[in-house]
Amino acid sequence: MTTDAELRELTVGTGAGGEQLGTDMVLNIGPQHPSTHGVLRLRLVLDGERVVSAEPIVGYMHRGAEKLFEVRDYRQIIVLANRHDWLSAFANELGVVLAVERLMGMEVPERATWLRMALAELNRVLNHLMFLGSYPLEIGAITPMFYAFRERETLQAVLEEVSGGRIHYMFNRVGGLKEEVPAGWTGRARTAIGEVRRRMPDLDRLIRRNEIFLARTVGVGVLSAAQAAAFGASGPVARASGLDLDLRRDEPYLAYDQLEVPVVTRTAGDCHSRFEVLLDQVYVSLDLAEQCLDQVDRLTGPVNTRLPKVLKAPEGHTYAWTENPLGINGYYLVSRGEKTPWRLKLRTASYANVQALATLLPGCLVPDLIAILGSMFFVVGDIDK
């Protein structure tokens, strides 16, 4: 015989008792999705169209780069160093050679230092243009992609001429650069920078104040400065939340201490702020690259250091970090005096930045998910290594 109490327990099961009955939906995004460079999986718990919890699941592109470093000599590791973040290839190989040079106490020719800075800033612009074109595409704006890739091709031709590679440059060497740049290259690079600077307002006007773009991004995916700091976020993601941090200014390497590096920041911490920081950083990097080219033209001398046939680093350890296009990358190198690293640990910007998704996504709507995910500007290979 059913009592009144049992009847009451049954009727509670609709509506208010939904949580106890497990009516929330678990949704897997990925492990393949068009808004990522690579393969990422998100495990979401949804209440209707609102995200209750989010868990980024990484590792699908893990290729064991850090273990492979241990069986490659100090010349060969450069080949691997630029592959985990293929949009920041020059910056990645630069960080590795800086760590090796620091451990060996090596002085790099001044001309090579300024050439490295010029190429690093051009690589930064190429990275940013990729996201400036692909991010609007993810939320329905097709045209900006064509503008962004027009500018990318202009600068890509310059880097391809100097290194021979379009994506994986492999132009850095321990002690400097692979070889001297072609005759007249600095002039052609300066011309390309001028063309991109002149045409960038076309992309700027097309998207920055577009009403539909503003509706999809303003106030969406807000990451506070405290949250960004807690997750170790850096680069455009952190600066859009108000963290005024840039290693080129705060912990200068190469010859950045001889330049005035403007740091672009915002305080809103939303998707639109992250996009604006990326856009404005393009102008800054174009200016810095041009200043570096001016210095290169004033300097003479070699661009590399003569090295022994077998290159061995002394026993010890060191840490080098760089301001990569997507944020701070760190390189912890341990040597036992052999021709291969005993350990080379990578601290990548994308890995730190993507952790914030677990805090950023809960509370948002499913239609806003792609807008938030795309605005975090990460490369999955940089996460998984």
Swiss-Prot record:
GO MF assignments: NAD binding; NADH:ubiquinone reductase (non-electrogenic) activity; quinone binding
Annotated EC: 7.1.1.-
Its membrane topology: Peripheral membrane protein
Cell location: Cell membrane
Any one GO CC term of the record: plasma membrane
Oligomer and partners: NDH-1 is composed of 14 different subunits. Subunits NuoB, C, D, E, F, and G constitute the peripheral sector of the complex.
Protein name as it appears in the record: NADH-quinone oxidoreductase subunit D 2
Organism: Salinispora arenicola (strain CNS-205)
Gene name of the record: nuoD2
